[in-house]
């Protein structure tokens, strides 16, 4: 039997670092939204009791370091599955970009195997398993627009009908999330009003939502990679409603209410960075 599963990218409409736990992890308060830039996983059962991961992206590890492998191995071991798997991962989401590609791939693997192996796990159970793999995986189980809190394990879907054009620009360098989080100083970090952003999104007030969007990690990442600020400035100059870094970077997204304005931003950025995508917020 073969299953094909889609894994959408995400952007952070709001990312606030609310505090730090005694175990060293940070308390997160974020609003994420899915966009229609997708990876695709094709999962096939094989007779041999092993997990084989292959991908069109040669930069990805295909062993236990890969989140897809981790997800498959975790479910296989926990539910005593004796058959093997071949997982083909068609990557379209840039890696090390702040777009949640690896987490979304892991979540897609969990969803697909839940179906393939007839495990009948609820979304809450999948979220709990996903959190063992990474802090963004719980959100990616159901994706959409959601408020994420705690260490990433608390996911509250938000019923907003706001949708807009999104331009993604990924510069030709990556960022280590661990490196950025090590630089956080709770005394000086910029804060984002997530409750106000949530309220604006639920009311479907686009202009109000724009005012409350932000990313607490931007200043830290831009201090290391000033080119990100140049991307933001160019997007705004071309008519974007807002330009923000997503996650710990380095990808910057612009929101544009009209496709004409989004096209203007795309055309300007194509001569500036190689990886430019025009997508919709789902």
From Swiss-Prot:
Q: Which InterPro entries match?
A: GHMP_kinase_C_dom, GHMP_kinase_C_sf, GHMP_kinase_N_dom, IspE, Ribosomal_Su5_D2-typ_SF, Ribsml_uS5_D2-typ_fold_subgr
Q: Which key words are in the record? A: ATP-binding, Kinase, Nucleotide-binding, Transferase
Q: Read off the Pfam families from this record.
A: GHMP_kinases_C (PF08544), GHMP_kinases_N (PF00288)
Protein's UniProt keywords contain Cell membrane: no
Reaction(s) this enzyme catalyzes, per UniProt: 4-CDP-2-C-methyl-D-erythritol + ATP = 4-CDP-2-C-methyl-D-erythritol 2-phosphate + ADP + H(+)
Q: Which terms under GO biological process does the entry name?
A: terpenoid biosynthetic process
Q: Look at the named UniProt entry and state the broad enzyme category this protein falls under.
A: transferase
GO MF terms on file?
4-(cytidine 5'-diphospho)-2-C-methyl-D-erythritol kinase activity; ATP binding
The catalytic activity of this protein is classed by the Enzyme Commission as 2.7.1.148
* HAMAP family per UniProt: IspE (MF_00061)
In which family does this protein belong, per the annotation? Belongs to the GHMP kinase family. IspE subfamily.
Quote the protein name from its UniProt record.
Answer: Putative 4-diphosphocytidyl-2-C-methyl-D-erythritol kinase
Species of provenance: Streptococcus mutans serotype c (strain ATCC 700610 / UA159)
């Amino acid at each position: 039997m073969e299953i094909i599963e889609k894994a959408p990218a995400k952007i952070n409409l709001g990312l606030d670092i609310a505090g730090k736990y005694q175990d060293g992890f940070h308390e997160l308060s974020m609003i994420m939204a899915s966009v229609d830039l997708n990876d695709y996983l094709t999962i096939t059962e094989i007779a041999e009791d092993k997990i084989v991961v292959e991908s069109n992206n040669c930069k990805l590890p295909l062993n236990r370091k890969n989140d897809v492998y981790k997800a498959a191995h975790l479910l296989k071991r926990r539910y005593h599955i004796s058959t093997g798997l071949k997982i083909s991962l068609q990557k379209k989401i840039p890696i090390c970009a702040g777009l949640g590609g690896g987490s979304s791939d892991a979540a897609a693997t969990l969803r697909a195997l839940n179906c393939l192996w007839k495990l009948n796990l609820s979304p809450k159970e999948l979220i709990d398993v996903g959190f063992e793999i990474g802090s963004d995986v719980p959100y990616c189980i159901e994706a959409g627009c959601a408020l994420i809190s705690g260490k990433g394990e608390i996911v509250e879907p938000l019923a907003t009908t706001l949708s807009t054009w999104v331009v993604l620009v990924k510069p030709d360098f990556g960022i280590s999330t661990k490196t950025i989080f090590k630089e956080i100083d709770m005394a000086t970090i910029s804060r984002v009003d997530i409750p106000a952003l949530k309220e604006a999104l639920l009311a479907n007030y686009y202009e109000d939502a724009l005012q409350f969007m932000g990313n607490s990690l931007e200043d830290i990442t831009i201090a290391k990679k000033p080119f990100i600020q140049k991307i933001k400035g160019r997007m705004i100059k071309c008519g974007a409603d807002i330009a923000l870094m997503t996650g710990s970077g380095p990808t910057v997204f612009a929101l544009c209410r009209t496709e004409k304005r989004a096209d203007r931003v795309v055309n300007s950025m194509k001569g500036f960075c190689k990886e430019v995508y025009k997508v919709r917020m789902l």
